[in-house]
């Protein structure tokens, strides 16, 4: 089952004519659709005035009264993040793999936010040292200056969280040059590879990120949660694993970080 979910998360569906790809939580499926549209995941109705951005391309637009939106002809040579934001809804992002993907109408389902949701960051973040190969995953789309090799955020979790199952959700991540990412063809580096990005909660390591993609979840052990107190998430980018006289950090970009309780 884990392998099936993993494959669904990474799959990209190419369609022709009026056939559209529906995106929901990083999973794609095919349906008939004439234009790009953002809809409510429960009602199926179009969501008005949702903001659509492709940060690396400095593109922004908004949906109309029916949730429809247009995308111009944008040159995309490597996977690039598209983000959807609307007040009262969970932030959503997906990875566009090529310019051809934008030629196919897409339907994006977004879910209303819950009271227990915690939005950590909806901006695109560049981790690393700004030193990367042109063959690195998504190197051509890196536009932001690095904030350093790690990202940390403090936030409060209530005692109710300890009675739920909690996850750190990473909307999208690009740029990982791990051994697994290389094996999957996500970069073109001939020999070198990096260690995976590491996730820490209150100073304890809770997971790793090995591949680029959307809607990746890391479970937060309830035993580590400090109820009604400050908690901290830290994401550390990996390092080049080839011998070197200095530390070479993997440059990655992440977007839409949140804590969800179920």
Where do the model's predicted regions map?
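Beta-strand-rich domain onsets/edges
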Residues: 18-33
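Short, ordered, surface-exposed loop/turn motifs in non-cytosolic proteins
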Residues: 32-34, 41-56
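Beta-strand-rich recognition domains
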Residues: 28-31, 42, 95-262
């Amino acid at each position: 089952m884990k392998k099936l979910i993993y494959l669904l998360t990474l799959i990209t569906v190419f369609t022709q004519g009026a056939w559209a790809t529906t995106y929901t939580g990083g999973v794609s499926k095919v349906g008939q659709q004439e234009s790009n549209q953002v809809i409510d995941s429960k009602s199926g109705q179009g969501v008005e005035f949702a903001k659509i951005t492709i940060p690396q391309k400095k593109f922004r637009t908004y949906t109309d009264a029916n949730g429809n939106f247009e995308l111009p002809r944008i040159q995309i040579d490597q996977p690039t993040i598209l983000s959807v934001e609307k007040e009262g809804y969970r932030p959503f992002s997906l990875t566009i793999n090529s310019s051809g993907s934008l030629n196919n109408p897409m339907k994006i389902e977004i879910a209303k936010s819950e009271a227990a949701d915690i939005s950590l960051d909806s901006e695109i973040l560049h981790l690393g040292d700004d030193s990367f190969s042109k063959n690195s995953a998504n190197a051509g789309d890196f536009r932001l200056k690095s904030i350093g090799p790690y990202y940390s955020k403090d936030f409060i979790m209530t005692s109710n969280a300890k009675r739920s199952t909690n996850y750190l959700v990473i909307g999208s991540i690009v740029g990982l040059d791990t051994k697994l990412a290389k094996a999957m063809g996500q970069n073109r580096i001939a020999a070198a590879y990096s260690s995976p990005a590491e996730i820490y909660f209150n100073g304890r390591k809770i997971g790793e990120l090995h591949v680029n993609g959307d809607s990746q979840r890391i479970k937060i052990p309830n035993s580590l949660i400090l109820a009604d107190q400050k908690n901290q998430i830290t994401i550390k980018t990996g390092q080049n694993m080839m011998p070197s006289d200095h530390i070479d950090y993997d440059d990655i970009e992440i977007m839409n970080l949140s804590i969800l309780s179920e």
